[in-house]
């Protein structure tokens, strides 16, 4: 796994994802190589060196695409292994054992993905449904815990609209996972400070990783929650990203692009009173400690 701890890291992104069949919308097929390479070059000029790519099997993952992007742009892409959430599971999640699902993850970590030399560096994006953990999602979380315990690779989760994060952590902890090796995704989609504080108190990292998606939750509220965490001295448990998933998110297609976090959100954060050191903690120091 290539990772540069001296640069910034986007903790939850997608470079190649295809949920278009499920969502009946071609915009959800993110696969435009030239446009994405240009955006990765732009990120490199702004100090980003690592992108954590959260597209796992059956979400449209493309290992060769990631390898090609790395070779062309020089950016590090950390690939993942796992299963997303119940609505997107292939049939065999129901029929295979927990141990078999865990072994699939271990194989992608230790041997490689889809016959390529690219190995998964993280167990992710493992998810739960809104307001509940289904039996199959619980099965995947247990398998992820087994794979983590065998390989030591960290776990990054998907919460649906900032629900079930505490329950995810309880499930992983019950199966032997050190919660300092877990980061909870999508904590920034509702007024969620109380739960965020509890998750951090348990030892986990939290991600504000849908930055720019103001139709879900406005960035000014994200900034207010980040201030509340800063005031409590808890920025050492926060990571940032944007969760780009659609063609329309790309700058070439009229979207805000992967660098919106750096060109728009961080300046807003700085203007609100955050120091450059605060920014560096969330974008460099925390990811470097967590993902390596």
UniProtKB/Swiss-Prot annotation:
Needed cofactors: Zn(2+)
PANTHER family reported for this sequence: PHOSPHOTRIESTERASE-RELATED, PHOSPHOTRIESTERASE-RELATED PROTEIN
Alphabetical list of InterPro entries matching this protein: AryldialkylPase_Zn-BS, Metal_Hydrolase, Phosphotriesterase
Family recorded in the similarity comment: Belongs to the metallo-dependent hydrolases superfamily. Phosphotriesterase family.
Protein name: Phosphotriesterase homology protein
Keywords linked to the UniProt accession: Hydrolase, Metal-binding, Zinc
Name of one Pfam family that matches: PTE
Subunit structure, as described in the record: Monomer.
Zinc found in the keyword field: yes
Protein's organism: Escherichia coli (strain K12)
Keyword Hydrolase: yes
Gene3D superfamilies: Metal-dependent hydrolases (3.20.20.140)
Record GO terms (molecular function): hydrolase activity, acting on ester bonds; zinc ion binding
Function: Catalyzes the hydrolysis of phosphorylated glyceryl acetates in which the presence of a phosphate group is required for the enzymatic hydrolysis. Hydrolyzes a dibutyl glycerol derivative suggesting it acts on phosphoglycerol substrates with a butyrate leaving group. Also active with aromatic acetates and propionates. No activity with various sugar phosphates, with various nitrophenylphosphate or nitrophenylphosphonate derivatives, or with phosphorylated or non-phosphorylated sugar lactones tested. Does not hydrolyze non-phosphorylated carboxyesters with long chain leaving groups.
Residues noted as binding Zn(2+) 1 in the record, renumbered to the chain: 12, 14, 125, 243
Binding annotation for beta-D-glucose: 148-149, 176, 178, 181, 280, 284
């Amino acid at each position: 796994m290539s990772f540069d701890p001296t640069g910034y890291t986007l903790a939850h992104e997608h470079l190649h994802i295809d949920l278009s069949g499920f969502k009946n919308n071609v915009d959800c097929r993110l696969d435009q190589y030239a446009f994405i390479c240009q955006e990765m070059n732009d990120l490199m000029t702004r100090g980003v060196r690592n992108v954590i790519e959260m597209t796992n099997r059956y979400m449209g993952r493309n290992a060769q695409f990631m390898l090609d992007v790395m070779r062309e742009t020089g950016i590090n892409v950390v690939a993942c292994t796992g299963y997303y959430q119940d609505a997107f599971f292939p049939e065999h999640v129901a029929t295979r054992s927990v141990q078999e699902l865990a072994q699939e993850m271990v194989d992608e970590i230790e041997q490689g993905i889809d016959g390529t030399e690219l190995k998964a560096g993280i167990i992710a994006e493992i998810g739960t449904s809104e307001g509940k953990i289904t039996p199959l999602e619980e099965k995947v979380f247990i398998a992820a815990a087994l794979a983590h315990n065998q390989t030591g690779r960290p776990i990054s989760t998907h919460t649906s609209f900032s629900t079930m994060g505490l329950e995810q952590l309880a499930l992983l902890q019950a199966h032997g996972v050190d919660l300092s090796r877990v980061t909870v995704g999508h904590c920034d989609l509702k007024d969620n400070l109380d739960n965020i504080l509890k998750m951090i108190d348990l030892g986990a990292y939290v991600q504000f990783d849908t930055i720019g998606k103001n139709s879900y939750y406005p960035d000014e509220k994200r900034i207010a929650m980040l201030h509340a965490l800063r005031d409590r001295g808890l920025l050492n448990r926060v990571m940032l990203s944007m969760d780009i998933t659609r063609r329309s998110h790309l700058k070439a297609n009229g979207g805000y692009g992967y660098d919106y976090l750096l060109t728009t959100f961080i300046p807003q954060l700085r203007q609100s009173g955050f120091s450059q050191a605060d920014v560096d903690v969330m974008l460099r120091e925390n990811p470097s400690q967590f993902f390596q």
